[in-house]
UniProtKB/Swiss-Prot annotation:
Function summary: Cell wall formation.
GO molecular-function term, one example from the UniProt record: ATP binding
Species for this entry: Granulibacter bethesdensis (strain ATCC BAA-1260 / CGDNIH1)
Pathway: Cell wall biogenesis; peptidoglycan biosynthesis
Annotated GO CC locations: cytoplasm
Binding site residues for ATP: 115-121
Name this polypeptide is given: UDP-N-acetylmuramate--L-alanine ligase
Length: 481
């Protein structure tokens, strides 16, 4: 891997504990650069970086800069941050996270994966395929890849796979050779302003690929399909379940452990088709089959064999917080999932049904007041696959409250939209007792959100088991008396 000039000095990351920032910091550290950083609080990413030998300071203070010669910030870091202000006062370059990622991407041939949903899993699947093909890729992902125990991988090969962040438009800076778009639903409109502006951003993202590159687009998504005529000067490959898709899944058989399917691949120029042998994916949900099709589209163009695909997918270990089982007690399964957009929530709850749940109990922690406000009607209608919905307070993620947009308004909205069983969660300390009162053997409890609900999902199995043991003891005592 060609190096950046070694004279750039120590690189300081403000907000290094974020998933995107931590990945770039770890890759630069593994390349031999002096890396340090700060974050407002300790978390798993901070601990992982420290274990790797990276100094991380808790809290933001001008003194944290030390001898840093470059400062990297995310879009969440404001100009009034004391470290950023100190860097500018010292005339130290301050670069955005996406700019630093773009510099790393220039050292390789890059695949960038964009979309409202499915980016992290699709990035992980492409990485798994390239690794199985012995292409030794470098990977920078937006979630922890279970096979790595981290969200990054430094490879010696010529290819890099990255998750492209559309939230602040910074994915337009990324110099990708292959651009993947999984879907486009209204999201991050606080940055884009309108859905039309967001769609134009995605079109620019794809248009940025060079003439020797190509775009991989999900034709099943109407907004993505609408973009195709505007890309006539670029090479594209479509995927999905539609008969119009160049890479199409057929003969799908699902069970509670995953899916087996075949893929029909059509050459856009010759219209010749071929069929792959059966592929096994140990993941639930039609949306994950779609993510796999995106990886197959990339692999086909890179000349990777079907046998490599079979091996890569069959051994795929998934991504942290993507339908992750945290425990099972008394026949009740606890699932932790990052889903926080209505489309994601609906897909995860469908997957729980597919897994053979007797019933599904959704525990939802809305993430950001602005998201709940802009997608309120969608939130009120996306949970029909849950027999019961438990709604927690909004995780504000630094936002100020919006009047009339809160836990209780969502509870009322779900009920008004026809959901038969919706209850507010007074606080996380009451979750286990509520689940104990509602859940029965065979049920799935699915904890959904991008906030601290993941911590609740981790402790819930043990808390629930304790309550079950107490109830069992009381029943035995009662029957014996």
């Amino acid at each position: 891997m060609r190096a950046l000039p070694l004279t750039i000095g120590t690189i300081h990351f403000v907000g290094i504990g974020g998933i995107g920032m931590s990945g770039i910091a770890e890759v630069l550290h593994n390349l031999g650069y002096a890396v340090q950083g700060s974050d407002i609080s300790d978390n798993q990413n901070v601990r992982r970086l420290r274990e790797a030998g990276i100094q991380v300071m808790i809290g933001h203070d001008a003194a944290n800069l030390g001898t840093a010669q470059v400062v990297v910030i995310s879009s969440a870091v404001g100009r009034d941050n004391p470290e950023v202000a100190a860097a500018r006062a010292k005339l130290i370059p301050v670069v955005r996270r996406a700019e630093m990622l773009a510099e790393l991407m220039r050292l390789k041939w890059a695949v960038a994966v964009g979309g409202t949903h499915g980016k992290t899993t699709t990035t992980s699947l492409i990485a798994a395929v390239l690794e199985a093909a012995q292409l030794d890729p470098t990977v920078i992902n937006g979630g922890i890849i279970n096979a790595y125990g981290t969200n990054t991988r430094l490879g010696a090969g010529e290819w890099m796979v990255v998750e492209a962040d559309e939230s602040d438009g910074s994915f337009l800076r990324l110099p990708a050779v292959i651009a993947v778009v999984t879907n486009m639903d209204p999201e991050h409109l606080d940055h884009w302003g309108t859905a039309e502006a967001m769609e134009a951003g995605y079109q620019q993202f794809v248009s940025n690929i060079p003439f020797y590159g190509f775009a991989v687009l999900c034709i099943d998504h109407p907004t993505v399909q609408k973009m195709i005529p505007q890309l006539s000067d670029h090479r594209i490959i479509t995927y999905g379940f539609s008969p119009q898709a160049d890479v199409r899944a057929e003969r799908i058989n699902t069970d509670k452990f995953g899916a087996t399917f075949e893929v029909v691949i059509t050459d856009r120029q010759t219209r010749r088709t071929r069929r792959t042998p059966p592929l096994r994916l140990p993941m639930l949900g039609e949306h994950n089959i779609a993510n796999t099709l995106a990886a197959i589209a990339v692999a086909v163009e890179m000349g990777i064999s079907d046998s490599v695909l079979q091996s890569a997918f069959a051994s795929f270990k998934g991504v942290k917080r993507r339908f992750t089982k945290t425990g099972e007690t008394g026949g009740i399964t606890i699932i932790d999932d990052y889903g926080h957009h209505p489309v994601e929530i609906a897909a995860v709850l469908r997957a729980a049904r597919q897994a053979g749940a007797r019933d599904v109990i959704a525990v939802v922690q809305p993430h950001r007041y602005s998201r709940l406000a802009s997608l309120f009607n969608e939130f009120c209608t996306c949970m029909n696959d849950a027999g019961t919905v438990i709604v927690a307070d909004v995780y504000n993620a630094g936002e100020s409250p919006i009047e009339g947009v809160d836990r209780d308004s969502l509870v009322d909205g779900l009920r008004t939209s026809g959901h038969k069983s919706v209850v507010p969660l007074p606080g996380p300390e009451h979750l286990a007792e509520m689940i104990h009162a509602i859940a029965r053997p065979g049920d799935f409890v699915v904890c959904l959100g991008a906030g601290n609900i993941t911590a609740w999902a981790q402790t819930l199995p043990e808390e629930l088991a304790t309550l079950q043991a107490k109830s069992s003891k009381i029943r035995r005592t009662g029957s014996g008396g």
